[in-house]
Amino acid sequence: MNFHVFDTYVKANDGHTIHFDVITDKNDSTTAISFAKEWLKSIGENNLVVTTEECKFCHSESVPEDTEIEIMTNGYFIVQMEGCPKKLI
């Protein structure tokens, strides 16, 4: 099964750039933007501007099984790239 990757760059509340990918089974920008905002809120970055300018469809790909399970459970998976908070263990 192919999943859809939305490349996302947003300005954080402190001004630095947060770069991450939203991976979902829906090839829909509105849904990807909603997932991006949900994840940003979960890391304490509220009310950031996220539009189709910041969250753009990039490509479709297959994903590892654990990623697919998370997508099927939560609707999406975030691949943290640059400027993202350190993952808590």
Name every feature range the model reports, one short phrase each:
Residues 1-18:
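Short, charged/polar N-terminal "headpieces" of proteins
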Residues 17-43:
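Short, flexible N-terminal segments of the mature chain
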